[in-house]
């Protein structure tokens, strides 16, 4: 079972927006050393929208090779074209990914039946574990619990990243699926409570900069130690809030640069973190113990 702290890994770039393979390698090592339970490559935080297909598959291939089976690698392969999502998912399987994360189609706003057919088609076309991803704040598409319940019985669909931040939504999904269907948080601010409800982990932006703390939080929450989990959550709250002071992954890439983990690089239309946000994020890193 894929569970625990799953980092939504950034894709390091230089100042010209070229992929920085050396920094990527060092970030993977950082997570292996700090207790991260799985790596999600080229998802939203990994800037999948601005990577071309060859770059997309090369990031996955390199992460898989470096991890070498020590923890699961989940590849972001969602698209708003079903045909393209099948292609990306096939490529990820060929590259050795353990599972794929598929965001709901964005911009074209399919119906609930369209969502069911989209994800069912991909699951039937590519034999690899697949995780649904619902983040309506980014996609303008909200997959309802009834649709999730229908999809939960489709072969190869093993779980969902629920990123609405709505705990009632998580409760509704948990109540409508079997116990072996994995419900993950995709919202750092509410992740601890979702896991205490029965969720199996957190696909986390905050884990990029605080992997050990997020791993400890997830472990405590999943064993039912609410006191410990909530105490760690309180420590991380400044980061959970400030890492979204501008659009993700702008702040987290700046934070990793501030930590000396990667160059100052991001691709248009995203831009580097505005100067007014530097000190608030620096203070959050200090308050959470990431910077001294």
Swiss-Prot record:
Per its record, what are the GO molecular function terms?
Answer: 4-hydroxy-tetrahydrodipicolinate synthase activity
UniProt enzyme class? lyase
Q: Where in the cell is it found?
A: Cytoplasm
Q: Which reaction is the catalytic activity of this chain?
A: L-aspartate 4-semialdehyde + pyruvate = (2S,4S)-4-hydroxy-2,3,4,5-tetrahydrodipicolinate + H2O + H(+)
What Gene Ontology terms describe where this protein resides (cellular component)? Answer: cytosol
Q: Which residues are responsible for catalysis?
A: 133 (proton donor/acceptor), 161 (schiff-base intermediate with substrate)
Site annotation (Part of a proton relay during catalysis) points to 44, 107
Pathway(s): Amino-acid biosynthesis; L-lysine biosynthesis via DAP pathway; (S)-tetrahydrodipicolinate from L-aspartate: step 3/4
Top-level taxon of origin: Bacteria
Per the UniProt entry, what are the Gene Ontology biological process annotations, in alphabetical order?
diaminopimelate biosynthetic process; lysine biosynthetic process via diaminopimelate
Q: Which EC numbers characterise this protein's activity in its record?
A: 4.3.3.7
Q: Which InterPro entries match?
A: Aldolase_TIM (IPR013785), DapA (IPR005263), DapA-like (IPR002220), Schiff_base-form_aldolases_AS (IPR020625), Schiff_base-form_aldolases_CS (IPR020624)
* Keywords recorded for this protein, A-Z: Amino-acid biosynthesis, Cytoplasm, Diaminopimelate biosynthesis, Lyase, Lysine biosynthesis, Schiff base
Q: Which CDD domains match?
A: DHDPS
In Pfam terms, one family for this protein is DHDPS
The record's listing under PANTHER family reads: 4-HYDROXY-2-OXOGLUTARATE ALDOLASE, MITOCHONDRIAL, DIHYDRODIPICOLINATE SYNTHASE
The family line of this record is: Belongs to the DapA family.
What is the annotated role of this protein in its UniProt record? Catalyzes the condensation of (S)-aspartate-beta-semialdehyde [(S)-ASA] and pyruvate to 4-hydroxy-tetrahydrodipicolinate (HTPA).
Subunit-structure text: Homodimer.
What name is this protein filed under? Answer: 4-hydroxy-tetrahydrodipicolinate synthase
The scientific name of the source species is Pseudomonas savastanoi pv. phaseolicola (strain 1448A / Race 6) (Pseudomonas syringae pv. phaseolicola (strain 1448A / Race 6))
Lineage runs: Bacteria, Pseudomonadati, Pseudomonadota, Gammaproteobacteria, Pseudomonadales
